[in-house]
């Protein structure tokens, strides 16, 4: 039987952004990170709407991957509905990575390029797949891992919550062991800090996930802090309820902003066009690549 041990979260605007568009959920047994996009305040609205939907949606008796997928689909409905009626948020969207601890293990739901990691036996494994243009190029052999790290379109995502009426959700169950640590984070961390560095920080702070989260955010800022940074960590087994949220990362992170609360809003570190345009651009590039591969095969 899976049981939540300690848990912690931290979010930071980073060094290059004026506002924070990330949101998180720290409500055991439910954990999540959302990284909004859309420019102005739209990205922050999207991430907060999606995060709030996770906490106030009753999935009924559904369990496992279907439950997590239904939660994300409800978040998608709310974000898309808001963007459809509010011109100021048109085209907004958000990534969403969710972990739900159940008796059968940890259920993961995922859309976008935020990530979930599992730390076990002194090893780290990325358990979600990035829905991004760069990852598609990697899978087809068009880019090397080294080229992907500096690719100018590495922030272009191919799937997001809220940009369309429906969304495909990756959902699956991870079997757990006592001592496992799960880490959910926005790309503001993973673009700045390598996986082996993340592992090193977690391994040195297994008994203090609050400290681990703080050190990971600090490492991302030392690496440049080019985007908002959000980290949620929780362990399996051990003592219940040792939660920690830093003073800038309270549960207000899932509250909807009003006209007077703009200091925590941020523009996502994305060079390409925001919102739906990013998805369209990604699709067009993929089509062009497929055509070029077909022509290359015919001419051989």
Tell me the role of every PLM-derived stretch.
Residues 1-300:
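PP2C/PPM-type serine/threonine phosphatase catalytic domain
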């Amino acid at each position: 039987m899976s049981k939540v041990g300690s848990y912690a979260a931290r979010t930071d605007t980073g060094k290059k952004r004026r506002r924070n568009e990330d949101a998180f959920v720290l409500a055991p047994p439910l954990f999540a990170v959302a990284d909004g996009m859309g420019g102005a305040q739209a990205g922050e609205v999207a991430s907060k709407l999606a995060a709030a939907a996770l906490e106030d949606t009753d999935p009924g008796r559904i369990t496992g991957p279907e439950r997590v997928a239904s939660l994300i689909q409800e978040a998608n409905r709310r974000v898309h509905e808001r963007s459809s009626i509010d011109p100021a948020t048109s085209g907004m969207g958000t990534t969403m990575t969710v972990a739900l601890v159940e008796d059968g293990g940890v259920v993961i739901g995922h859309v976008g390029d935020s990530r979930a990691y599992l730390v076990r036996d002194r090893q780290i494994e990325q358990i979600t797949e990035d829905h991004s243009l760069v990852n598609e190029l990697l899978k087809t052999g068009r880019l090397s891992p080294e080229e992907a790290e500096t690719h100018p379109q590495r922030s272009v995502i191919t799937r997001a919550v809220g940009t369309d009426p429906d969304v495909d959700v990756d959902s699956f169950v991870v079997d757990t062991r006592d001592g496992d640590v799960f880490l959910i984070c926005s790309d503001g961390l993973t673009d700045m800090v390598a996986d082996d560095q993340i592992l090193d920080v977690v391994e040195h702070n297994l008994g203090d996930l609050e400290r681990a989260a703080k050190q990971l955010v600090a490492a991302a800022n030392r690496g440049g802090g080019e985007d908002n940074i959000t980290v949620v960590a929780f362990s399996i087994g051990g003592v219940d309820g040792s939660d920690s949220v830093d003073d800038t990362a309270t549960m207000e992170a899932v509250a909807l902003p009003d006209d007077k609360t703009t200091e925590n809003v941020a523009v996502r570190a994305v060079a390409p066009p925001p919102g739906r345009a990013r998805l369209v651009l990604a699709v067009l590039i993929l089509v062009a690549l497929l055509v070029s591969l077909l022509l290359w095969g015919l001419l051989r």
